[in-house]
């Protein structure tokens, strides 16, 4: 069974642990709307702001000629997304961003409004509630509405479908988010140079049910600070905030190298040994007789490969401070102290 959003092959033991009928799982996994975890837990994905904006835009165009109560739009990963239209009138449609299991997603339930009129060709405009980019270096040019390139392509594709369905020459669509300015203050936008609303984002069209700093915004946040901690997960994030209170802490998961490419200034890499040390030496367990880095640490804390992997991480860090912690926040290795 393959998760079509991230192309991950789900292990059979994870599927068995879920306790759910296989047919039901296959259907939901194929839709892109659920994630199966290693313990068998099933979490619900949602749709990104890009997908929701696409639905509002397409529905607005369709409403020029007919009544619309639901809409289907393409996503960047090739799946179709299906959303209800909560309100519509000729040339105007409202779509709500559906809830998901991402507890920190402040945009859940937010209304996206599309306003459309017939035109020559297709044009997409950002209206009230979509932030404006105020600095250089982001994916969207300074002074433009904060609709990232991938969701802009998605919105245009959705509008193109509507235009072709109705036989129009084109359409001009304005996307508005009535509560966008208020919600934007609860996001990272002000820290990366986007003001006046939220950003329209989404590289896959789906929101993962955990906080990864909203995908592509992660790189923007790293680039906008000169004191950053790149951490590997929730535990690392919690203790990094405690260990390095003067730093901006960004969770990069296994994408440590990608985070480093975006970072400059004072950089710390902090996390659990399983990710940090294996990033240093991906082959550290080969032929060692140990199944995991944690097992090696517990059974052979002085193992030469632990030291070797740490030294390789320091070398790959190119001057970044490397800090390895355990699950209770104790520092196991620190390149600054030589520990």
UniProtKB/Swiss-Prot annotation:
E.C. numbers:
2.1.1.195
A GO molecular-function term, please? Answer: cobalt-precorrin-5B C1-methyltransferase activity
For the biological process aspect of GO, one term held by this record is: anaerobic cobalamin biosynthetic process
What does the UniProt keyword field contain?
Cobalamin biosynthesis, Methyltransferase, S-adenosyl-L-methionine, Transferase
Q: In which pathway does it act?
A: Cofactor biosynthesis; adenosylcobalamin biosynthesis; cob(II)yrinate a,c-diamide from sirohydrochlorin (anaerobic route): step 6/10
| Matching InterPro entries | CbiD, CbiD_sf
At the top of the EC hierarchy, this enzyme's class is transferase
Which reaction(s) does the protein catalyse, per the Swiss-Prot or TrEMBL entry? Co-precorrin-5B + S-adenosyl-L-methionine = Co-precorrin-6A + S-adenosyl-L-homocysteine
Record keyword Methyltransferase present: yes
PANTHER family from the xrefs?
COBALT-PRECORRIN-5B C(1)-METHYLTRANSFERASE
Q: Which HAMAP family match?
A: CbiD
The entry sums up its family as follows: Belongs to the CbiD family.
Q: What protein name does the entry list? A: Cobalt-precorrin-5B C(1)-methyltransferase
